[in-house]
From Swiss-Prot:
ATP binds at G11, P12, T13, A14, V15, G16, K17, T18. The keyword Translocase does not apply. Signal peptide: none annotated. It is an enzyme of class 2 (transferase). GO terms for biological process: tRNA modification. Monomer. It holds the Pfam family IPPT. It catalyses: adenosine(37) in tRNA + dimethylallyl diphosphate = N(6)-dimethylallyladenosine(37) in tRNA + diphosphate. The record marks T102, R128 as: Interaction with substrate tRNA. Substrate binds at T13, A14, V15, G16, K17, T18. Its EC number is 2.5.1.75. This is tRNA dimethylallyltransferase. Its cofactor is Mg(2+).
Length: 299
């Protein structure tokens, strides 16, 4: 089976993945697929660091604004949506470029989790429904029975982990249809932290408070409201924190999230990282993509 070549850009938040994705899309006739679990939601633009209107006009973006904030979204949903987008992009002779930071989503797509083949989709849905009916105590008992330990336990993580364990044999044998070039962006920790702090400041200047307050007043308990960028501001709205304290909390949580992202990509995916402050960046990335696609550099 001839596999479909795709480019995947990963790295910590605020590292510049969107800008690189647009650059590659222009250079290699590509279209971008968002691999971010929060950017699927309509009306949540600033806190999710969604590509701006100008950026979306510079390159076609997929899987942005495809869910209402009241709806849930999972790795299963992402794989189904991403598969359709990849097929659509390739059918028009273009290069799929996945830009994202949600490690589980990307791993699920690239390693065949929830793809067709040996995995019985109806069985997956039935098992997920069974788990969702359990209370927290019974759900975590299932984790212990299966010798599963996960960090920062919550229901969604627990259900994902149990699904993977339940269908491990089928998933192990499920072959992905893609040949990915995984490009990792990173730099010194202080460089990344400074970029995160600057981004949070820009978000607040650009209207994050209004966006977060709308979410808090209308849908404070939905899945979308638990994303970094919103929940940190909720205490400010009820007078439990000053704006400066809430802003600092958001910066700290985002830095911690960036660290977790890097740990995930290093441990779970075969990533070769490029420093964004290197003198030959992004030319070195363009060269890697050109070699991957078997293209010659234009003279």
């Amino acid at each position: 089976m001839t596999k479909i070549k795709i480019v995947v850009i990963v790295g910590p938040t605020a590292v510049g993945k969107t800008a690189l994705g647009i650059s590659l899309a222009k250079a290699f006739n590509g279209e971008i697929i968002s691999g971010d679990s929060q950017q699927v939601y309509r009306q949540l633009d600033i806190g999710t660091a969604k590509a701006t209107q100008e950026e979306q006009e510079a390159a076609v973006h997929h899987l942005i604004d495809i869910r209402e904030v009241t709806e849930s979204y999972s790795a299963y949903d992402f794989v189904q949506d991403a598969q359709k987008s990849i097929s659509d992009i390739v059918s028009r002779g273009k290069l799929p470029i996945i830009v994202g930071g949600t490690g589980l989503y990307l791993q699920s797509l690239l390693e065949g989790y929830h793809l067709g083949g040996q995995v019985d989709q109806e069985a997956v849905k039935a098992y997920r429904n069974e788990l969702e009916q359990l209370d927290d105590h019974d759900l975590y008992e299932r984790l212990q029975v299966n010798n599963i330990t996960i960090e920062q336990v919550n229901r969604r993580r627990a259900i994902r982990a149990l699904e993977l364990a339940q269908f491990a044999d089928e998933l192990e044998n499920a072959e992905t249809a893609y040949e990915p070039l995984i490009i990792g962006l990173n730099d010194d920790r202080q460089v990344i932290y400074d970029r995160i702090n600057q981004r949070v400041n820009r978000m607040i200047e650009n209207g994050l408070l209004e966006e977060a307050k709308w979410l808090y007043e209308h849908y404070p308990t939905v899945q979308a409201s638990r994303g970094i960028g919103y929940k940190e501001l909720f205490p400010y709205f009820v007078g439990e924190m000053t704006l400066a304290e809430a802003s600092d909390q958001l910066k700290q949580n985002t830095r911690r999230f960036a660290k977790r992202q890097l740990t995930w990509f290093r441990n779970r995916m075969a990533v070769s990282f490029t420093a964004i402050t290197a003198p030959d960046y992004p030319q070195v990335v363009h060269d890697r993509v050109r070699d991957f696609l078997g293209q010659k550099e234009k003279s």
